[in-house]
From Swiss-Prot:
Origin superkingdom: Bacteria
A Gene Ontology cellular-component term: cytoplasm
Its EC number(s): 4.1.2.4
Gene Ontology MF terms: deoxyribose-phosphate aldolase activity
Stated role: Catalyzes a reversible aldol reaction between acetaldehyde and D-glyceraldehyde 3-phosphate to generate 2-deoxy-D-ribose 5-phosphate.
Family to which the UniProt record says this protein belongs: Belongs to the DeoC/FbaB aldolase family. DeoC type 1 subfamily.
Gene name as annotated: deoC
Catalytic activity line of the entry: 2-deoxy-D-ribose 5-phosphate = D-glyceraldehyde 3-phosphate + acetaldehyde
Protein name: Deoxyribose-phosphate aldolase
GO biological process, one term: carbohydrate catabolic process
Enzyme class: lyase
Residues forming coiled coils: none
Pathway(s) this gene product operates in, as recorded in its UniProt entry: Carbohydrate degradation; 2-deoxy-D-ribose 1-phosphate degradation; D-glyceraldehyde 3-phosphate and acetaldehyde from 2-deoxy-alpha-D-ribose 1-phosphate: step 2/2
Secretion signal span: none
Amino acid sequence: MNTIISPKEIALYIDHTLLKPEASPAAIRTLCAEAREYSFKTVCVNSCYVPLCVEELQACPVDVCSVVGFPLGAMLSSAKAYEAKLAVAAGADEIDMVINIGLLKAGELEAVRADIETVFAACGEADLKVIIETGLLSDAEKKSVCQICKEVGVAFVKTSTGFGHGGATVADVELMRAVVGERCKVKASGGVRNLADARALIAAGANRIGASAGIAIVNGEEVPPSR
């Protein structure tokens, strides 16, 4: 991939993200205004804010992405599916679900598959991205869950929530891309704070960047790590 992709082109890769528990309606409106101004691919928000984002982004090419089962993934699959169904009904174009990490760590791969399939079925025409939380997984576990995602046929595999240990790395994106090939896209999320990071992840195979630092990225600036 082109490692000298321009900042303007980078904007089309970015899910402009605000998932903090203290995020207010006013902050979500600002997020949407920024996404319109910079032509980001989507805004990524908690499901309660999907209707507001749909309202704010009317007649605008920016899509709405909702997280589901976020950030732990440790809820009933039926509850994740219901949240996804409601978000899609409210206008979400994309769903980012968190897998049941504990089941994957326990080697219960069929249960992990069932969890993903249940949410996938609830998404209808919306694209499903599956967050695997790479910072908590061995390489073997990353490969196993990416293979499941490939077989189920989800739209994306995604590195991280940004709430757990670690974030997106070039090595993880390369590993995920090697497993899914062209069958799924790859979203790199977690700790992407500058243009160089974004370019490196795209060069490694990422099709999408999840970041709260989208404006800094396209402006060639850097956001310091959160504390």
